[in-house]
Amino acid sequence: MAEITASLVKELRERTGAGMMECKKALVEANGDIELAIENMRKSGAIKAAKKAGNVAADGVIKTKIEGNYGVILEVNCQTDFVAKDGGFQAFADKVLDAAFAGKITDVEALKAQFEEERVALVAKIGENINIRRIASLEGDVLASYLHGARIGVLVAAKNADEELVKQLAMHVAASKPEFVKPEDVSADVVEKEYQVQLDIAMQSGKPKEIAEKMVEGRMKKFTGEVSLTGQPFVMDPSKTVAQLLKEHNADVTNFIRFEVGEGIQKVETDFAAEVAAMSRQS
């Protein structure tokens, strides 16, 4: 068995663009023969997949699964809406979801490692980068999920509530994007940041600091209500807040998770005209 040195792995990475573990594995299988390793990687699609890895995967699907008191929510990304609807891509996402659920896996890196070979093969087949982006779980007395076109997914956990009510709350979370369950849950750093923004706005209007501070106190109460689930008007009946709805049912929401495909991912927009102009200048 030939020794697989760090310099050999480095050379293969530079020549193929594949990941370190992928290169090391290929070299082990080729008994240290770098040319054979490259040939094998070409056959398996690993090199093609590595070239796709730099492409921004900002489309994709959200998947959820609930059984009893345990639920998981998963985001798997691809590059286009067309591939997001592809049967092979959907099957891959379902398989990842089932494995995460069965093993109660919430470490996305562990999940990525488990499915790396299948991901690479799928990238080579469909020609787009694919990324298992995030996974989260939720436990509670009553759980419900809601998917909006597979692009927005929500899990809600509640106590003393029937499943239909919790389902409606999941739909509310999908539509209204709360960040916290209750106003008192809004973190101190978020409150402080918003307070300073509102104080600056009030001071710019020429108000004395004492009056500006009193104005901001009222605005902060409104702000914490707007970003919390229980403080928001219920989307199906805006005449009452979610807190009032829960009180009517003697119910309580303990937690929720909301995923939206691609949120926070910077998608590169190509200016075709500028690209053509740049190419013409180079010619």
Swiss-Prot record:
Cytoplasm found in the keyword field: yes
A GO CC term assigned to this protein in UniProt: cytoplasm
Keywords from the named record: Cytoplasm, Elongation factor, Protein biosynthesis
Molecular-function GO term, any one: translation elongation factor activity
KW Cytoplasm (keyword) present: yes
Cysteine disulfide partners in this protein: none
Location of this chain's protein in the cell: Cytoplasm
Region entry Involved in Mg(2+) ion dislocation from EF-Tu, spans: 80-83
Domain of life: Bacteria
CDD domains attached to this UniProt entry: UBA_EF-Ts (cd14275)
Family listed: Belongs to the EF-Ts family.
Function: Associates with the EF-Tu.GDP complex and induces the exchange of GDP to GTP. It remains bound to the aminoacyl-tRNA.EF-Tu.GTP complex up to the GTP hydrolysis stage on the ribosome.
Name the record gives this protein: Elongation factor Ts
Originating species: Cronobacter sakazakii (strain ATCC BAA-894) (Enterobacter sakazakii)
Gene: tsf
